[in-house]
Amino acid sequence: MDDPILTIEEREAINSGRWFSSLSPSLRHDILRCAFVKRFKDGDLIAARGDPPDHWIACAKGAVRVSSTAVSGKQVTLTYVEPGIWFGDVAMFDGDRRTHDSYSHGDTTILCVARADFQKILASHVELYEALMRLQARRIRTLFGLVEDLNTLPL
């Protein structure tokens, strides 16, 4: 059974994350109050492509490998989500199923907020919308940079 409490190191990783630490104390409190802990061993499946968006997730320890599997069966790693990073919010907004597989990389602890709690937090903390928009903007800028590099760097 999962230990329902974050360790001191895991809590510090969440609290010191660039995005999360920028939120108001009351919003951070409400997010953490609703969250629950899940622990995984190296290589465990956390979420599969096609899964419903049941949770908003933060990595607290280890890493989450986000990947896609080609028709040929080749698995392509898209990114590693490190401690302090939140993810899965896009599916929470649009309600579509998960678009990629996610696996634990090393012993991994994640913090999860159920979809219903996510919606309640959004309703009581309008600032979360703006904060998530800033997070998405940062992700889009990073993506544009990667696309630019792919198109301009020599092979």
What do these predicted ranges mean?
Residues 1-155:
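Cytosolic regulatory regions built on CNB/CRP/Popeye-like sensor folds
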